[in-house]
């Protein structure tokens, strides 16, 4: 008996939508739907269809109805059926899809061939084997409670490993109970200003633009503090009477590259003590110093006045969403209260893997390898500039994964356009300047040297030198 069978649609196969509607018997409707799915390309050639029983259960049909529909489509050549391989879409069942000829676009700059943007590590150097080994060990050793709800601070194994590592390598004074694991620097900043701290916040006049966007989204007003070759001009903080928090990159000021002078480190801590304020220490590029030992963390001068924030986004990969905050005692509970309400916790397996990776010494070995690799990259950049553009000065090259190339006044925008035509993705210095900064504007390029693959790095440097203004 014919019937109108509508408002019925289900999923079959590999997430392909099968629409069962229209007049006719259930067998006829199913045959038509399968034929249309093959004809339109929804069911690709050689796709294996579900067994009769499974599809019948999914669609609320009799098994014989599905079997008859399959048999009919096999006879028509839409499907094939073989013992042991099930029922599949015939390889020549569907007509070829029409090829769309794109309209010719107007001539423009080429797509970037070389990525020289800052802030990105060498993805090809991720220690896959060592990370996999650490993950297997960590998973085998994980206690049952690791697969439960967990501690909002993060796994104790990782917090203990971080406390030991940070004390040894960065001079951080802490214990595991004052470390809160999060999923990176940006989530840490959201937590702190999502209900724990209030603005206005002093920031460096040149800094990461996404920090400012994130803070603006949280309705936090930022006040710029000048920077020079020695980091932030901390003496300017006293002029901002309402400011109770300052965000700094003391290990390697971003983007200018200068480490904060020892006397300025002491000065900012004295300011925080006198005003009852806090220093947020972004340990940007703290692991990658080439010409001498990495400078110690400001947090070591006063753990009750400094929030130390770090992550593995540069040392390992931004794909591993792990970071940490080392908090003063009085902030631990407020941060945990906000974290429990607002932020998804970092993955337990990644936490356990990183703990093993640190404890086994694999993290130290990886960092030593990467320091040498990035030092070599830096040296090739400075050598290319010395040979082909000696009038261009590179600054901030003692640490980190980028350099600032100082350009003649008024040439930044034209150089960026030339770089685009050379197939380069690179940032201008103006992008990182605070809108209310009062320090003089400077023209420059912020050139990352961590990302290009080895085989293409020479070509990237050639393209960069061609884009620079003549001397």
Residue locations for each model-derived region?
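N-terminal basic, amphipathic alpha-helical segments
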Residues: 1-138, 147, 336, 340-346, ...
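Short, polar loop motifs at secondary-structure junctions
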Residues: 206-210, 430-435
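Flexible, Gly/Pro-enriched loop and linker segments at secondary-structure and domain junctions
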Residues: 305, 426-428
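Conserved core of the PLP fold type I
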Residues: 135, 145-275, 287-289, 293-301, ...
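Active-site PLP attachment segment
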Residues: 84, 302-334, 345-349
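Residue-level detector of anion-binding/catalytic polar loops
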Residues: 221, 278, 424-425
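Short glycine-rich anion-binding loops that position phosphate/pyrophosphate groups of nucleotides
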Residues: 119-121, 250-254, 314, 452
